Amino acid sequence: MIVINMFSSANKVAGQGVGAVYTELMGLLKHDFANEFQINVNRYTRSDISHYHTIDPKFYLSTFSKKRGRKIGFVHFVPSTLDASLKLPRVARWTLDRYTLAFYKRMDELVVVNPNFIPKLEAYGINPDKVTYIPNFVSQRTFHPVSREKRQALRHANGFKPDDFVVFGAGQVQDRKGVGDFIKLAQQNPDYRFVWAGGFSFGRITEGYERLKKAVANAPANLNFTGIMPRETMIDYYNMADLFLLPSFEELFPMSVLEAFATDTPVMVRDLELYQQIITPYTITAVDVADMQARIRALADDRELLATYAAKSH
């Protein structure tokens, strides 16, 4: 039996995709490969494979041990992706960038969830031959469609009328997630209901924290910011929604889109190059907020078109 030591603190910070990715992978290994792999978590005993999901300093130090076996690192971000996420003092940011790359360079193999990251890593001096693209995934044991009756019951319990057009979005409240555009769309469509699940996972160091906090506090009446929500509850919101909208300006391979797909919910995203190889064929794409507005209106007025995209998401 192959011994794998998983190293992760992904679930210490609630409401971020890294934790969802880790949870799904652990569920898959334990459910489908229990007789092939012995999985240890944050143990420093000898292993055949050490799989690093987060870049904690103590994990970095462990890479110098001969007990680690083959070292595999999960690339959830590169320095450039932090620009629109975190606001740090210049020295702290310089240190974090260099530490991140040093961690990745300690690995024997790296896993990326989007093939667009391979040339970015190469630009940072990492050999692309040791980088493998493995897409994220979501178990349909966790996320799945519900019956029409249960959907209506969920909508009633959460204050939605049967004929409400509900637009759902999810993710950390950050500029890069397009939260500002989500708010603007809610303002432009007072006859529709909008819900955003997610909060400030990194608190005050979130880029644009004060401005975004004020925007959330003054959201229009038809927009509800739920705050950080457990994944077990998220399935209800996907199933209540008529449309899942993720207006992000920058992503890797968003778990929220896969969760929406798993519940047969139509998905709209911003038209980004990084999506083209992974999810674009199955989504409604929009170039900007005006395009999103037009497409939302078209979908709300044409249930057959909405059903077409629901079928694509499956």
What are these regions (language model features)?
Residues V91-L110, K213:
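Membrane-proximal helix-turn-helix segments that form the acceptor-binding/catalytic region
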Residues K161-K177, I183-Q187, V195:
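Conserved donor-binding/catalytic core segment of Leloir-type glycosyltransferases
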Residues R193-E210, G227:
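Glycosyltransferase donor-sugar binding loop
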Residues G208-E232:
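Nucleotide-activated donor-binding/catalytic signature segment of Leloir-type glycosyltransferases, i.e.
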Residues I228, D236-A241:
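Short alpha-helical donor nucleotide-sugar binding micro-motif in glycosyltransferases
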Residues F249:
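Aromatic "clamp/platform" in nucleotide-sugar-dependent glycosyltransferases that forms part
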Residues A262, P266-V269:
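Short hydrophobic beta-strand element within catalytic cores of glycosyltransferases
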Residues V269, T280-D291, R297-E304:
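Conserved acidic donor-binding segment of nucleotide-sugar-dependent glycosyltransferases
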